[in-house]
């Protein structure tokens, strides 16, 4: 754990001490080095399942894929941000990269925490850099409104969790995940216990977000700069799913009765957000709503608590993290050239940027879960688990996948095909940096297709 955490912390002096000429080069190279070191976590040597560096930090098959995803994304975010941050004063550039590195530090400590209270603190700490990135480097004036939504939704959801954790500490005497998963089931039968159960999960359902608690997400995504959108879609939403998986083990007897309304909301959200996507004109908003739909499937898979549901959820979280991040990068490359997120005003780009169209096509196919990509594997496992739980869910999930395919193709055709609008007269060609960025997003998806057991979690 420390072999990644210490180099990440050492990024801070690197950022502030390197000369302005070499700032982006050194930080990109160092973060790539950290990303490659983190791949060693995937080689599992421990017999117990837990690979602990001390009593506070440990990795297990559930957190390892998410830790590696976090480390993999930092260099990609730095690469994606170079163009639009380069024109700012050097100290602001340093501040921006510092915020991205601090986000990675908090995420590693959140996914690697063995004490739930430490996970909670790091879960909340990620809020501050994300909020600064959205409200300081966002594109439009609405970014302050988006930041307010983001802050208050997350805080309002998280306060009950803190109270619930203090009550858990009082009743069991420990908040260690290692101890709690082997302790006797808690006898939960009163109304107070049911409220406590909801308090444990609401924070994670807001973060995922569950349909109905999702209004902060499209606003935050649309207003955030490219790196903010990437980290939000790829890793911050996954904190919610990861936290739910960790907490569900302890809430077992009650979840069987109380999870129904949340499963219904999650599945209903898959269809509703898909239909919303079909009516979107804003490219980033469409990708943001598609994230809500995919995370609805993940929430459904986790809430029914079967091994297939859990495995499908973690596979879909990793695959969706890479895919949605790639889509936001592509949306940014088109925005940097046309200065518009409205799809009708930025259409027909296949004529000008043919290779970028290939990346759009692959990313959209991954988004609609084309076989044999891991997105399909995750969705199939969740759909199968839900079908075993109740055969009627196949109607909802089947319609959901159909609508997903529809809006993915709608996004591709609207942004790439057709004639170029008359107001677009001068477009710069694609940079090698952008092609490298897309390659590094899509290569892991293809490699995971060949060896999916790297992200199967505990079911391996």
Swiss-Prot record:
InterPro entries tied to this protein? NADH4_N, NADH_Q_OxRdtase_chainM/4, NADH_UbQ_OxRdtase, ND/Mrp_TM
Subcellular location, record wording:
Mitochondrion inner membrane
Which UniProt keywords are present, listed alphabetically? Electron transport, Membrane, Mitochondrion, Mitochondrion inner membrane, NAD, Respiratory chain, Translocase, Transmembrane, Transmembrane helix, Transport, Ubiquinone
Provide GO CC annotations from the record: mitochondrial inner membrane; respiratory chain complex I
Where would you find the membrane-spanning parts of this chain?
20-42, 61-81, 94-113, 114-134, 148-168, 195-215, 225-245, 258-278, 285-304, 308-330, 351-371, 380-400, 436-456
What Gene Ontology biological process does one annotation of this record name? electron transport coupled proton transport
Any one GO MF term held by the record is: NADH dehydrogenase (ubiquinone) activity
Q: Which Pfam families match?
A: Oxidored_q5_N (PF01059), Proton_antipo_M (PF00361)
Catalytic reactions on record = a ubiquinone + NADH + 5 H(+)(in) = a ubiquinol + NAD(+) + 4 H(+)(out)
Q: EC number(s) for this protein?
A: 7.1.1.2
On whether Transmembrane helix is a keyword of this UniProt record, the answer is: yes
Membrane topology term? Multi-pass membrane protein
Instruction: Tell me the protein family, please.
Output: Belongs to the complex I subunit 4 family.
> What function does this protein fulfil?
Core subunit of the mitochondrial membrane respiratory chain NADH dehydrogenase (Complex I) which catalyzes electron transfer from NADH through the respiratory chain, using ubiquinone as an electron acceptor. Essential for the catalytic activity and assembly of complex I.
Its quaternary organisation is: Core subunit of respiratory chain NADH dehydrogenase (Complex I) which is composed of 45 different subunits.
Name-wise, this protein is: NADH-ubiquinone oxidoreductase chain 4
Q: Which organism is it from?
A: Danio rerio (Zebrafish)
């Amino acid at each position: 754990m420390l072999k990644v955490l210490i180099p990440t912390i050492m990024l801070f002096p690197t950022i502030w001490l390197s000369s302005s000429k070499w700032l982006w080069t050194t930080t990109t190279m160092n973060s790539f080095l950290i990303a490659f070191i983190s791949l060693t976590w995937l080689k599992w040597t421990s017999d117990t399942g837990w690979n602990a560096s001390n009593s506070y930090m440990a990795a297990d098959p559930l957190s390892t894929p998410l830790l590696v995803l976090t480390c993999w994304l930092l260099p990609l975010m730095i690469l994606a941000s170079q163009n639009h941050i380069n024109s700012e004063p050097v100290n602001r550039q340093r501040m921006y990269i510092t915020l991205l590195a601090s986000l990675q530090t908090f995420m590693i400590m959140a996914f690697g925490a063995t004490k739930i209270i430490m996970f909670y603190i790091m879960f909340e700490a990620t809020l501050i850099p994300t909020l600064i990135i959205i409200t300081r480097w966002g594109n439009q004036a609405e970014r302050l409104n988006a930041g307010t939504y983001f802050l208050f939704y997350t805080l309002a959801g998280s306060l009950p969790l803190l109270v619930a954790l203090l009550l858990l500490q009082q009743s069991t005497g420990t908040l260690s995940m290692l101890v709690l998963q082997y302790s006797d089931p808690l006898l939960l039968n009163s109304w107070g216990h049911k409220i406590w159960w909801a308090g444990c999960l609401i924070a994670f359902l807001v973060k995922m977000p569950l349909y109905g608690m999702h209004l902060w997400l499209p606003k935050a995504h649309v207003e955030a700069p490219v790196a903010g959108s990437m980290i939000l879609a790829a890793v911050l939403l996954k904190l919610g799913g990861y936290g739910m998986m960790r907490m569900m083990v302890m809430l077992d007897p009650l979840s069987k009765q109380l999870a129904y309304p949340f499963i219904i909301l999650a599945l209903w959200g898959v269809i509703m957000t898909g239909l919303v996507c079909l009516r979107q004109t804003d490219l980033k908003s469409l990708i943001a709503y598609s994230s809500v739909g995919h995370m609805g499937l993940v929430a459904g898979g986790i809430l029914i608590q079967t091994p297939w549901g859990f495995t499908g959820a973690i596979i879909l979280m990793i695959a969706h993290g890479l895919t949605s991040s790639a889509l936001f990068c592509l949306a940014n490359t088109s925005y940097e050239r046309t200065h518009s997120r409205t799809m009708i005003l930025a259409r027909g780009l296949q004529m000008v940027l043919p290779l970028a169209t290939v990346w759009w096509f692959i990313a959209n196919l991954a988004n609609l879960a084309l076989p044999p990509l891991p997105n399909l594997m995750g969705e199939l496992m969740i759909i199968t688990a839900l079908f075993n739980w109740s055969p009627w869910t196949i109607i909802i999930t089947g319609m959901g996948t159909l609508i997903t395919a529809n809006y993915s193709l709608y996004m591709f055709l609207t942004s790439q095909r057709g004639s170029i609008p008359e107001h677009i007269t001068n477009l710069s060609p694609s940079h090698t940096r952008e092609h490298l960025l897309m390659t590094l997003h899509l290569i892991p998806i293809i490699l995971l297709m060949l060896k999916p057991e790297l992200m199967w979690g505990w079911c391996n």
